Amino acid sequence: LRILLAHNSLYYPSYGGGDKSNRLLMEALAAMGHSVRVVARVEQFGGEAHTALVRELTGRGVRLDAHGSASVEFRLNGVEVRILTRDAGLRAYFTAQVQAFDPAIILASTDDPAHLMLEIALRAPRARVVYLVRATIALPFGPDSGLASAFQTEALRQADGVVAVSEYVARYTQQWGGVTAIHIPISLLDPGAHPDLGRFDNRFISMVNPCAVKGISIFLALAERFPSVEFAAVPTWGTTAADFTALRKRPNVAVLPPVDDIDDLLRQTRVMLVPSLWAEARSRMILEAMSRGIPVMASDVGGLAEAKLGVDYLLPVNPAVRYWPMVDELMVPMAEIPPQDLQPWAAVLGRLLTDRAHYEQLSAESRRMALAYARNLDVRPFEAYLCEVLRLPRRRAAAGRRIPRAPLSDERRRLLALRLKRAKQHVGD
């Protein structure tokens, strides 16, 4: 199959969970013998971004096929990658790529919340369009949407297939959007060994992407409750300047840079905290940590229960249910964060810090369940789904529908995409 991913984000190198999940999915499809191309973009267009990306890629040993015009082209683990860098005309660039590559399948996803690329994909004369839902906040409907839109909802209904990262997301999509979605595993683990890194004497209680909606308030409160314990925060797309200030005020909190190899963080981690306060679609961090024997304390919201695989601990929170009509300086929608009851979290963490036998039992159970899940986690069910989609008539042709156009200029659509793109879950993981 000729498969084209419309990726309205950087793709590589990137530390976002959704970006990483899309990359591993494309590489797995390429390893199955399919011809796979990705069209992506830098965060901010221009000559400086172009030069910085070229420098970063060459420093990582990536051989560039082309980098002299408006984009950077290279092959990564069997996947053709085209990243637009200098020119803000993403829609025109993607249109040209669709015409040149002539894919049988176009994959779009919630990393394109304003549907800048989905609308073009739906107009492709031959390709089937499959939409990957990795984040409820980037859907155009429902209580967890960052931007409700009847136009975008109608466009999504014309996709030939919709695949959700969790059963929770599949139910949400059906309930609030009237869009039939199927849950198929689309967040694969890195190939290769998953070392046993869980140690009672490891240094840190860790959290990735500390910010308001991810539960930085719980993280900081735990650091205050346990002043003699070392905590580690790894800021990524959601951590604001105010969050950095709050983290640095705590003498027992180390602020660490994000890493390419998650094992570099996990081998220092005693317990992983995932105290999210919004409706997480899923979390690849939970599975990555558990597969290495790291106990995970996660909040009981969204699809996190599925990610925990029935293993302790899933803890109560007061979730954010109201979003303000504004974004922070990182363009993340701002939520009203309710007060939290720290006691359940403090009780569990206290036990994991003092009861070695319990820690080691939970570490072993976490690893056993995660590796059992991972043994059956591969791209073949998704590949079979794509083949099934190809056997059916194109949905928009069968329905005789016109592709809706939202009444927005390209400039406003780009702004809306920018306002939401950092809020996707990887999401999401």
Where are these regions (language model features)?
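N-terminal subdomain of nucleotide-sugar transferases
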Residues: 1-60, 224
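Conserved catalytic-core segment of nucleotide-activated headgroup transferases in glycan assembly
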Residues: 190-251, 255
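Short hydrophobic beta-strand element within catalytic cores of glycosyltransferases
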Residues: 295-298, 308, 314-316
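Membrane-proximal helix-turn-helix segments that form the acceptor-binding/catalytic region
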Residues: 145-161
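Acidic donor-binding loop of glycosyltransferase active sites
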Residues: 267-281, 294
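Donor nucleotide-sugar binding/catalytic pocket of nucleotide-sugar-dependent glycosyltransferases
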Residues: 157-193, 199-201, 213
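A charged, aromatic-enriched C-terminal amphipathic alpha-helix characteristic of glycosyltransferases
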Residues: 336-347, 353-384
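Active-site proximal beta-strand in glycosyltransferases
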Residues: 105-107, 120-140
